[in-house]
């Protein structure tokens, strides 16, 4: 029934057949070796069962048995299933697994010896055995684990003989049947091939005999063979003899047995039998009787031919090969067995093996003999009498017999399996069979019988595995056609056809595995990134078991959101997958999926996802402006070799100098130079490399090579030019020549002659060669400066990039073109300038421009409001026709015109429209204006008579007019709008304002109408083709604004952030920058503001080298800053770049310094700088007098810190990315050539820029980070420039030096701007005055508060005064004092300087105590100035506010120092002692002054008031009491002309000293020069009203001019009253000689004298003389006579002589207040000094300051005198004017006033007390005077009396002081009676 599933068991090469077969079915991986046995439950006795131990066996057990009990039947399968092919175990059977230390596989062999497996799902052999190997217990479905038997128990049970260590070989399974299953009726299951080998000695029984049993068996010899394992073919059966297994010791060898073909006798054999030899060891083990094959029934059909096979039946003694299929083989001889007969009723069942557990063994031997047949051979004898298909047996063959004797070992008389020896011998020889075969010809042919291919399932082979078990062999058949013959001849009858099989075909048998295959294993190997190529390659390893088919391996690339980006199929034979076009900084997921088939259908396995990200972080030079090829010779001299005409022979001397737009220079050593041809252009390819440096190629890929291309310079041919350098040089040398472009030219690396490439006035012709329109590319300056009579035509300017923000009048073609022609020119690019910036030319002067176009950008930064135009700023009588503009205009404060700003015809009315026109032109683009500036989309204006016609605008104007900019459009149309005709703007395109009336008359047209008009304008310039030079493409020259637009993940809204991050990360590539920029939040200032610089800080100080930092300061363009903490990153992963994480930003910071070892270079530079001394020749070549710089102390400091300074210098300067001795050599040469300049510059900056901002020192920032404000100059060049000239190093020019060489370089033009900016940026201060006081550590500033309300909110403080022209030189020295201690008194009019050292205040305690004295003096100075601010006329009052309106007058204390003596100019006192105030301040600023010991103080003034007017104290100390008086004196000289006299100057004929001492100087009693007690007024001192004062005691009480005038009236009238009383008392004495009391104030006509320009009558001086004899006798009866005769008292008056108001001899003379000056000595012109001062006070007292004092002392009436009095400004003219002709001379006026005073006095005055007596009446006073005069006259002749007028003078003083005191300083009424 299951015929096709029969198997036999055979011992083959020592392997039990069941093992071999099981291996085929299961094909396990042998991981351990084990032996498994079924054990019959009957063998496991009750005793043994009691010995079964529960739990798991001890792992130390070497041998043990596992006991299982079946709990269900195994599942059955299909017909092909092994389980259904053989008997099944009965339910309840036990499974005993013998286990040695290792287990290989589980093979369960059933009752009949067949292999029985659990169902496929029940036991996974590998997993199960591996588990058993580890844990000792196998869990198997269908079996229940019972327990285990130890090795000792197994021995007791007699089950240990099969378990010896050496008996089980790896892979071998020995099965013992111990169960007695029920007999089966299925004869197929009872065949002998289904018997199993028993490893224990089997009982020998005789097989039952049959009638057909042969009597004899021929013998055959058995030979050893090494045949391979037999193949089991489908449909065939193999019989196998039981293979003996030796259980104890040694290996078992097997010898082959001969295979004998078995055929039924009914079919004759036509072929000799084939022999099959099988190796066996020793003699075969005789089978038990129950193991012999039962007899097949006779009706069993014969096996088909293709299923017949050699069968071997297990024998005990004999086997008969010729036995028919239905016969049973009988043994010829019987052998005794221990149990010869089966028990009754149990036939067919396996006998039970008894176990004899004995421990002592007796061994012996037993010999057995068996006979076997030997086949005979057949001999064929040819017979030509018969046809070839006829044969006759001549003799029958007979078989031989072979006897085999085997000796076995016996144990306790029981035979064992063990074979000790085997011998064979032939008992009966073989008799060959003889057959005659016909050879008579017949027609025969042979044909091939194709073999068939059959498949057999094999569950030992992995599914999907196909294995050829038997090769197919084609058969042969013979086809015989037999013809009937007559006498040997054929007849025509059809032949008889017979087919004879000559060779049967052998089927091809293919075993098809059904066992589940191992899973293939796919693993990640690695992922290799190629960052520059934006790719990554994933590599795998694949382990694929045979038979498994890999359907696909796919790699899916997913983005961060899980979206599939791409999918790549991985080839099985190339396990690499490259993913290209990856994005940087994108987190990708790599998902790998493998689909495979193990014969069970497709299965899918996913690998663990891998994350991958390409982070490109390299060094990239960005924002490149220019790349130059530099050559350095052996001496270190640099030469620009960019304009190559041949390939350099030695690249070792070359380096690339890469300059960015912000002026940063990077140097790269050149590795190679190659001449190449690209697009027909010969170029030089220069290559450099540096660590981690990448360069962007033209195709936007990145390379690790830095390559720059230079054009090969071709020489001119005649006047045709092929290189720009040669062209501009020749045009400069020969500006009248004719020049032609023979090709496109490139201006890169060509140096301009100045502001333009050609500075000479060009008068020649420039064009392209005929029929060409060539282009000059890459202009960075205007082509021409100016031209006259020139012709420019037929060329273009391409890629223009002019960036000149400092320059006015900037245009690509040039500035001025006079009487020139410009035609057919196209300009494309960008132009930036200050004021007057255009796209073509600045001015056309009677010139013609036609068909010229500009396309690009224009940016005017200036604020002067100049004209600027899209093409032309000013067109003066010039014609601009058919021109075109399409661009973006940005203006700050300019008068822009979209095409032309000013179209100006001029005043010639006869050629209107012929000249001065703009016609047939187009303007497009945008115009963005900060200030309106009267800008227009088409023009600014067309005054006068400029003809503007047929023009079209599409300009979008923001903050300007849509067409016509100027308000003049609404002016007289005859000059303007009448000539503005047919000009249109395009509706819905052009935009802008129309704020003027006539603007609204300008019409719009549609785009279509505009296009139609434009088509007829003849404009073609805009269409001229411009091809980018190949070097532009190769060098990737792009517009700065477009630099980031092509970068991955670029966001337009983050463009500013990217620019800003370049400052934080100056080295990194653009992709990195964009990625970092996109990480910022929208609120970040890096997104919203422009960054100027980023500077590292440590502990609150700037770090200017590569030292570690803990914070960075980000400085924004709006003047703000942010500080962020940073933390160092140990490895930036970019060579030579130091990196920090920035707190709160999520980005990194890298200092703008290359991080590399510079020790050697630092040493060399330091050596060079150290060699410089201040008195060296190098320094003296810069300044003849190094000592005049006062830099000795700073120079010493610099030398002491040179190590650190040089380190900072080089780290900021040296951006050499690769090692290059050439560049280093050039650097050292530069240092050597400029070492004196460098060291002086460092010394200067160290001296003057150590400024403190709330503890933040500014010095190193100035030295090494001048890029802080946004510009990036070369540090070395910056220092060299500073140190190159003496004027840059002098302390008195610190302000100018900053402006000239520092400010413009760093981006802050003025020092004041720098200090104010820094103050706001770095400190909490908002006022520079407050900050300065705080920052100037060694300066005490006294700022007395003004009482003048109008001045309180004006600039009047210390910094206001210092930041004022000439005082600017003091700012930096004061901020940088180290040892000197200065104090400054700052008022709105003056600024006074002195030092604590001068007054011997050398300790902090002394200085602090002295500050109160400083404040006292400061208050006095302020009080004086405030007095004048109240007194001065409103029109000139603000002239006193010099701190705001001019320059405060400097006041310098003298240079005498307590304990040091007088200091010389160099700052050394007596004995050479250092005077630090001079060394640190007064010396360097040139404010030291030599002491003039002949004067107390002096003023230096100019003929006209000047900013450098100054006051110097000489002998007098500023801080002395008299110092205040001296201050009022000297400042009178400075201020009087501008403020004290209402703006009028000194009265003609007077000079300086006539106005100070004795007039406007505040008197002080500390001096003895007559000032105190003379006419005057106290404007400065605050005194007590104690009755001892001579002047107003508190100036601030007189808080208005009216009060001051009132005071002066009381002051003068009190003195006049006293004079009147004295005069009256003297007159009453009736003197016979008037000279006893009086003398004369006479006139002296002026003569030639110093400072006098008026000579002769009527120009007079005062002449004080004695009375003439006549005058002595002159009767005096009233005061009027004294007035009329100009008598003066002898007392109080100076000695006789001439008193001048000019010069320096007598003009100082004061007038004693108690002296009687009765007359006025009226002059007809100028006057003498005593009269001048006396009259001035009296005029002030009577007419007031404005109407009396000023007209008298100044030139106020000079104009009137010139008109009315022949130019004579005399007293007579003045009194007439002042009194309005009431008085004709001073004497009339004074007499009148005396009487007024007398009358008022008679009516009453303020009560006083004199010598204890109260006085309240005039009579009382008169009595006192008469007494005093009498006493004085009485002692006239007494020579012992020194003062003969003492009683009178003393009385006058007593009364005066009382009057002053009792009127509260004359601030209240002097006279008590009501005044009329």
UniProtKB/Swiss-Prot annotation:
EC class: hydrolase
Cofactor(s) demanded: Zn(2+)
Disulfide bonds: none
Post-translational modification Pentaglycyl murein peptidoglycan amidated threonine, affected residues: 76
Comment on bound cofactor: Binds 1 zinc ion per subunit.
Basic and acidic residues: compositionally biased ranges: 201-239, 252-262, 271-292, 306-347
Gene3D superfamilies linked to this entry: Resuscitation-promoting factor rpfb
Domain (G5): residue spans on this chain: 359-434, 435-516
Propeptide: 34-76
GO molecular function per UniProt: metalloendopeptidase activity; zinc ion binding
Region (Disordered): 172-382
The name this protein goes by in its record: Zinc metalloprotease ZmpB
Lineage of the organism: Bacteria, Bacillati, Bacillota, Bacilli, Lactobacillales
Encoding gene, per UniProt annotation: zmpB
């Amino acid at each position: 029934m299951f015929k096709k599933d029969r198997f036999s068991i055979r011992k083959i090469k020592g392997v039990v057949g069941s093992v071999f077969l099981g291996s085929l079915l299961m094909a396990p991986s042998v991981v351990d070796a084990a032996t498994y046995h079924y054990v019959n439950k009957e063998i496991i006795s009750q005793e043994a069962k009691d010995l079964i131990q529960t739990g798991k066996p001890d792992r130390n057990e070497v041998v043990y048995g596992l006991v299982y009990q079946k709990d269900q039947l195994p599942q059955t399968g299909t017909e092909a299933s092994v389980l259904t092919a053989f008997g099944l175990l009965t339910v309840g059977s036990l499974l005993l697994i013998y286990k040695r230390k290792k287990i290989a596989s589980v093979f369960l062999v059933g009752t009949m010896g067949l292999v029985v497996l659990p169902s496929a799902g029940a036991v996974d052999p590998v997993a199960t055995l591996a588990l058993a190997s580890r844990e000792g217990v196998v869990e198997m479905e269908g079996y229940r684990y019972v327990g285990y038997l130890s090795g000792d128990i197994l021995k007791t049970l007699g089950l240990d003989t099969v378990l010896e260590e050496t008996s089980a070989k790896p892979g071998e399974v020995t099965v013992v049947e111990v169960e007695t299953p029920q007999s089966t009726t299925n004869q197929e299951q009872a065949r002998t091939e289904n018997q199993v080998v028993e490893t224990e000695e089997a009982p020998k029984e005789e097989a039952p005999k049959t009638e057909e049993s042969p009597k004899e068996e021929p013998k055959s010899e058995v030979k050893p063979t090494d045949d391979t394992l037999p193949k089991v073919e489908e449909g065939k059966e193999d019989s196998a003899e039981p293979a003996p297994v030796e259980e104890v010791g040694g290996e078992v060898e097997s010898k082959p047995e001969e295979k004998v073909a078995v055929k039924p006798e009914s079919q004759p054999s036509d072929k000799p039998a084939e022999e099959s030899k099988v190796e066996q060891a020793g003699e075969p083990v005789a089978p038990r009787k129950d193991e012999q094959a039962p007899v097949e029934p006779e009706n069993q059909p014969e096996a088909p031919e293709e299923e017949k096979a050699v069968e071997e039946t297990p024998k005990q003694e004999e086997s008969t090969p010729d036995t028919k299929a239905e016969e049973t083989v009988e043994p010829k001889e019987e052998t005794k067995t221990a149990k010869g007969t089966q028990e009754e009723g149990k036939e067919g069942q396996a006998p039970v093996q008894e176990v004899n557990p004995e421990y002592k063994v007796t061994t012996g031997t037993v010999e057995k003999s068996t006979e076997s047949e030997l086949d005979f051979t057949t001999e064929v004898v040819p017979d030509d009498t018969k046809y070839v298909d006829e044969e006759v047996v001549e003799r029958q063959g007979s078989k031989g017999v072979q006897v085999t004797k085997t000796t076995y070992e016996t144990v306790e008389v029981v035979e064992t399996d063990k074979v000790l020896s085997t011998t064979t011998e032939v008992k009966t020889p073989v008799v060959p069979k003889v057959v005659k075969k016909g050879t008579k010809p017949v027609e025969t042919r042979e044909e091939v019988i194709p073999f068939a291919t059959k498949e057999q399932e094999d569950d030992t082979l992995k599914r999907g595995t196909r294995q050829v078990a038997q090769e197919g062999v084609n058969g042969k058949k013979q086809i015989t056609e037999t013809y009937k013959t007559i006498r040997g001849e054929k007849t025509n009858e059809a032949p008889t056809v017979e087919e004879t099989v000559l060779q049967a075909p052998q089927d091809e048998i293919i075993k098809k595995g059904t066992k589940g295959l191992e899973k293939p294993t796919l693993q990640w190997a690695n992922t290799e990134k190629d960052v520059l190529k934006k790719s990554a390659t994933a590599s795998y390893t694949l382990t694929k078991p045979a038979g498994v088919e890999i359907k696909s391996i796919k790699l899916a690339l997913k983005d961060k959101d899980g979206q599939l980006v791409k999918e790549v199929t991985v080839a099985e034979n190339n396990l690499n997958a490259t993913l290209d076009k990856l994005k940087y900084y994108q987190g990708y997921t790599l998902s790998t999926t493998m689909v495979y088939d193990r014969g069970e259908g497709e299965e899918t396995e996913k690998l663990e996802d891998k994350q991958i990200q390409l982070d490109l972080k390299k060094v990239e030079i960005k924002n490149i402006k220019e790349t130059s090829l530099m050559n350095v010779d052996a001496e270190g001299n640099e030469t620009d070799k960019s304009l190559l005409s041949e390939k350099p022979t030695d690249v070792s001397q070359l380096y690339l100098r890469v300059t960015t737009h912000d002026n940063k220079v990077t140097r790269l050593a050149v590795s190679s130079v190659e001449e190449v041809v690209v697009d027909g252009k010969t170029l030089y390819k220069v290559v450099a490399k540096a660590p981690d440096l990448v360069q962007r190629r033209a195709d936007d890929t990145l390379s690790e090579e830095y390559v720059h291309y230079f054009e090969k310079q071709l020489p001119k041919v005649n006047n045709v030019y092929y290189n720009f350098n040669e062209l501009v040089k020749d045009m400069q040398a020969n500006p009248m020549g004719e020049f032609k472009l023979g090709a496109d030219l490139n201006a890169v690396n060509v140096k301009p002659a100045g502001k333009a490439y050609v500075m000479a006035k060009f008068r020649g012709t420039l064009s392209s060669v005929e029929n060409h329109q060539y282009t000059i590319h890459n202009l960075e300056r205007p082509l021409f400066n100016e031209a006259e009579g020139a012709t420019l035509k037929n060329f273009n300017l391409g890629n223009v990039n002019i960036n000149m923000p400092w320059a006015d009048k900037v245009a690509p073609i040039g500035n001025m073109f006079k009487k020139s022609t410009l035609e057919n020119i196209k300009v494309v690019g960008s132009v930036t300038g200050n004021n007057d910036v255009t796209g073509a030319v600045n001015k056309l002067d009677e010139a013609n421009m036609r068909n010229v176009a500009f396309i690009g950008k224009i940016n005017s930064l200036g604020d002067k409001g100049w004209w600027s135009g899209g093409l032309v700023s000013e067109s003066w009588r010039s014609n601009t026709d058919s021109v075109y503009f399409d661009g973006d205009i940005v203006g700050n404060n300019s008068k822009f015109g979209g095409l032309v700003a000013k179209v100006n015809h001029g005043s010639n009315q006869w050629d209107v429209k012929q000249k001065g026109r703009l016609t047939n032109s187009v303007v497009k683009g945008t115009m963005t204006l900060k200030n309106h500036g009267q800008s227009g989309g088409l023009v600014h204006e067309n005054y006068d008579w400029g003809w503007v016609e047929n023009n079209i605008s599409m300009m979008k104007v923001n903050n300007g007019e849509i067409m016509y900019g100027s308000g003049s459009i609404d002016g007289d149309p005859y000059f303007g709008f009448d000539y503005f005709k047919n000009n249109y703007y395009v509706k819905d395109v052009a935009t802008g304002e129309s704020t003027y009336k006539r603007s609204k008359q300008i019409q719009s047209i549609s785009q279509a109408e505009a296009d139609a008009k434009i088509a007829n304008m003849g404009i073609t310039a805009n269409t001229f083709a411009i091809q980018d030079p190949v070097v532009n493409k190769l060098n990737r020259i792009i517009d700065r604004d477009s630099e980031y637009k092509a970068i991955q993940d670029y966001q337009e809204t983050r463009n500013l952030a990217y620019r800003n991050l370049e400052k934080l990360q100056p080295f990194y590539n653009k992709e990195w920058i964009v990625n970092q920029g996109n990480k910022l939040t929208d609120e970040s200032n890096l997104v919203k503001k422009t960054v100027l610089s980023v500077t590292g800080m440590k502990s609150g100080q700037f770090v200017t080298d590569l030292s570690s930092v803990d914070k960075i300061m980000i400085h924004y363009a709006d003047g703000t800053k942010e500080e962020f903490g940073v933390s160092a990153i140990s490895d930036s992963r970019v060579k030579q770049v130091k990196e920090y994480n920035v707190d709160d930003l999520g980005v990194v910071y890298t200092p703008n310094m290359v991080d590399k070892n510079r020790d050697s270079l630092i040493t060399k530079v330091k050596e060079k700088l150290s060699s410089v001394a201040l008195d060296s020749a190098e320094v003296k070549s810069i300044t003849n007098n190094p000592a005049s710089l006062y830099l000795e102390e700073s120079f010493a400091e610099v030398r002491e810190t040179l190590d650190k300074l040089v380190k900072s210098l080089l780290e900021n300067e040296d951006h050499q990315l690769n090692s290059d001795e050439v560049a280093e050599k050039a650097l050292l040469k530069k240092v050597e050539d400029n070492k004196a300049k460098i060291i002086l510059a460092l010394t200067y900056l160290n001296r003057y820029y150590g400024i403190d901002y709330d503890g933040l020192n500014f010095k190193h920032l100035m030295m090494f980070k001048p890029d802080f404000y946004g510009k990036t100059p070369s540090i070395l060049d910056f220092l060299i420039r500073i140190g190159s000239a003496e004027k840059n190093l002098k302390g008195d020019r610190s302000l100018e030096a900053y402006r000239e060489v520092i400010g413009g370089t760093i981006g802050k033009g003025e020092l004041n701007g720098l200090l104010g900016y820094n103050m706001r940026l770095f400190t909490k201060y908002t006022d520079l005055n407050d900050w300065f006081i705080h920052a100037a550590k060694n300066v005490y500033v006294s700022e007395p508060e003004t009482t003048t309300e109008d001045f309180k909110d004006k600039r009047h403080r210390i910094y206001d005064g210092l930041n004022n022209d000439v005082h600017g030189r003091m700012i930096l020295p004061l901020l940088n004092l180290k040892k000197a201690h200065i104090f400054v008194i700052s008022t709105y009019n003056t600024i006074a300087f002195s030092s604590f050292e001068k007054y011997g205040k050398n300790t902090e305690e002394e200085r602090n105590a002295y500050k109160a004295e400083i404040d006292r003096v400061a208050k006095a100075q302020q009080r004086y100035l405030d007095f004048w601010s109240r007194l001065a006329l409103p029109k000139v009052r603000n002239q006193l506010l010099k701190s705001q309106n001019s320059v405060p007058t400097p006041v310098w204390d003298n240079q005498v120092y307590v304990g040091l003596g007088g200091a010389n100019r160099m700052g050394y006192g007596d004995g050479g002692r250092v005077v630090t105030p001079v060394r640190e301040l007064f010396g360097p600023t040139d404010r030291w002054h030599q002491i003039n010991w002949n004067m107390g103080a002096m003023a230096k003034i100019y003929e006209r008031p000047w900013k450098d007017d100054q006051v110097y104290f000489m002998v007098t100390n500023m801080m002395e009491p008299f110092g205040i008086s001296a201050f009022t004196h000297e400042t009178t000289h400075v201020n009087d002309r501008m403020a004290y006299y209402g703006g009028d100057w000194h009265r003609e004929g007077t000079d300086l000293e006539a106005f100070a001492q004795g007039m406007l100087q505040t008197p002080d009693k500390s001096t003895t020069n007559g000032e105190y007690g003379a006419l005057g007024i106290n404007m400065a001192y605050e005194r007590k009203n104690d009755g001892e004062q001579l002047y107003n005691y508190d100036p601030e009480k007189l808080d208005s001019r009216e009060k001051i005038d009132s005071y002066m009236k009381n002051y003068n009238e009190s003195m006049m009253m006293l004079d009147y009383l004295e005069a009256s008392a003297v007159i009453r004495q009736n003197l016979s000689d008037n000279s006893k009391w009086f003398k004369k104030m006479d006139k002296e006509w002026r003569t030639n004298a110093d400072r006098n320009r008026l000579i002769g009558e009527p120009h007079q001086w005062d002449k004080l003389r004695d009375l003439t004899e006549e005058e002595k006798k002159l009767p005096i009866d009233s005061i009027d006579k004294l007035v009329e005769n100009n008598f003066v008292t002898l007392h109080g008056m100076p000695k006789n002589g001439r008193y001048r108001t000019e010069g320096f001899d007598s003009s100082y003379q004061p007038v004693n207040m108690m002296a009687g000056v009765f007359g006025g000595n009226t002059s007809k012109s100028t006057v003498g000094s005593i009269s001048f001062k006396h009259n001035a006070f009296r005029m002030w007292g009577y007419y007031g300051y404005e109407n009396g004092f000023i007209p008298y002392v100044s030139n106020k009436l000079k104009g009137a005198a010139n008109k009315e009095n022949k130019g004579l400004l005399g007293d007579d003219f003045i009194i007439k004017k002042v009194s309005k002709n009431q008085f004709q001379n001073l004497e009339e006026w004074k007499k009148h006033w005396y009487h007024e005073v007398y009358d008022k006095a008679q009516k009453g005055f303020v009560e006083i007390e004199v010598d204890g007596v109260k006085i309240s009446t005039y009579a009382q006073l008169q009595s006192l005077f008469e007494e005093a005069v009498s006493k004085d006259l009485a002692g006239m002749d007494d020579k012992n009396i020194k003062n003969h007028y003492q009683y009178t003078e003393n009385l006058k003083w007593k009364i005066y002081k009382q009057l002053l005191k009792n009127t509260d300083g004359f601030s209240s009424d002097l006279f008590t009676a009501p005044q009329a």
